[in-house]
């Protein structure tokens, strides 16, 4: 199974450390977090994209995806007035451009919290409008867009497989896909494999973590409560051939290399020998 490193955990170090560690530790690809100081889309547009492309070449590390920060700090396409919405969409479009230029496999976004007082019809109307515009843009430049479901601790919009199905039905674009961060279904008592059953070939990517079942905290495999060995067997048996990003975020960023090594070793130990 192909593995990806998420660069978010390296944000207090130069981004070259993330590429170097991904290469030396044996990851198969890298998922670029689009936040400062590493790969914020406007900074890439201003010239930083050259460094990202050079690092990918130097370390022979495929960029499997680009994940701009869209969960509300400061960009959230689901909350705020029209000026805020417009600014968020413009940033995501720029991120799609930068993903294309760095030869990323996809641009990954999420629908962050829409606010406690927003009624469902307004939430879904706004989501449909946003996704329609973004998908049209992605179609025009030839970039796949992945919508990530979040946990209920993070959002009240797209949080489970049925929400994803609703979003895909609202915007039936050939460039729109989804994925599963396995923490999200686990904390909601939703079977992870239901995503495979419901989404079929629209399931494009995986984020692998462990979970305590009661928060959105992302743990290294083996530190939580998930039956990961059994889950990975089912995923492999289902014929999944995409990347699995071991998504360490901010919990381990004091020693990102050490934990990235530990996470990869533990993850591969969960797999049958011919899949490691």
UniProtKB/Swiss-Prot annotation:
It comes from the Bacteria. One of its GO terms (molecular function) is isomerase activity. The keyword Coiled coil does not apply. InterPro entries: IolE/XylAMocC-like, Xyl_isomerase-like_sf, Xyl_isomerase-like_TIM-brl. Its EC number is 5.1.3.41. Its cofactor is a divalent metal cation. The active site is at residues 148, 247. It is an enzyme of class 5 (isomerase). Keywords: Isomerase, Metal-binding. Gene3D superfamilies: Divalent-metal-dependent TIM barrel enzymes (3.20.20.150). Transmembrane segments: none annotated. Signal peptide: none annotated. It catalyses: N(6)-(D-psicosyl)-L-lysine = N(6)-(D-fructosyl)-L-lysine. A divalent metal cation binds at residues 148, 181, 207, 247. Disulfide bonds: none annotated. The keyword Metal-binding applies. Pfam families: AP_endonuc_2 (PF01261). Homooctamer. May allow S.flexneri to utilize psicoselysine for growth. Belongs to the FrlC family. PANTHER family: HYDROXYPYRUVATE ISOMERASE, XYLOSE ISOMERASE-LIKE TIM BARREL DOMAIN-CONTAINING PROTEIN. This is Fructoselysine 3-epimerase. It comes from Shigella flexneri. The gene is frlC.
């Amino acid at each position: 199974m192909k593995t990806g490193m998420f660069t978010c955990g390296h944000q207090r170090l130069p981004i070259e450390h993330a590429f170097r560690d991904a290469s030396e530790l044996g990851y198969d690809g890298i998922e670029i977090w689009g936040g400062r100081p590493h790969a914020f889309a406007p900074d890439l547009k201003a010239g930083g994209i050259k460094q990202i492309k050079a690092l990918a070449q130097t370390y022979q590390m495929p960029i499997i995806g680009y994940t701009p920060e869209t969960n509300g700090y400061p960009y959230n396409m689901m909350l705020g007035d029209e000026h805020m919405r417009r600014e968020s969409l413009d940033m995501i479009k720029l991120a799609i451009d930068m993903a294309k230029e760095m030869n990323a496999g996809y641009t990954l976004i999420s629908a962050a919290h829409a606010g406690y007082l927003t009624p469902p019809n307004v939430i879904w109307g706004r989501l449909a409008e946003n996704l329609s515009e973004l998908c049209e843009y992605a179609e025009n430049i030839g970039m796949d867009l992945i919508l990530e479901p979040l946990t209920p601790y993070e959002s009240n919009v797209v949080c489970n497989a049925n929400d994803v199905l609703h979003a895909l039905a609202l915007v039936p674009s050939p460039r729109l896909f989804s994925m599963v961060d396995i923490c999200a279904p686990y904390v909601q008592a939703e079977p992870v494999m239901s995503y495979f059953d419901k989404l079929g070939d629209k399931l494009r990517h995986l984020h692998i973590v462990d979970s305590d079942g009661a928060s959105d905290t992302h743990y290294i495999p083996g530190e939580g409560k998930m039956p990961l060995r059994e889950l990975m067997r089912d995923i492999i048996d289902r014929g999944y051939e995409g990347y699995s990003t071991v998504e360490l975020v901010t919990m381990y960023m004091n020693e990102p290399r050490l934990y990235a090594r530990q996470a990869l070793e533990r993850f591969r130990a969960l797999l049958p020998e011919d899949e490691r």
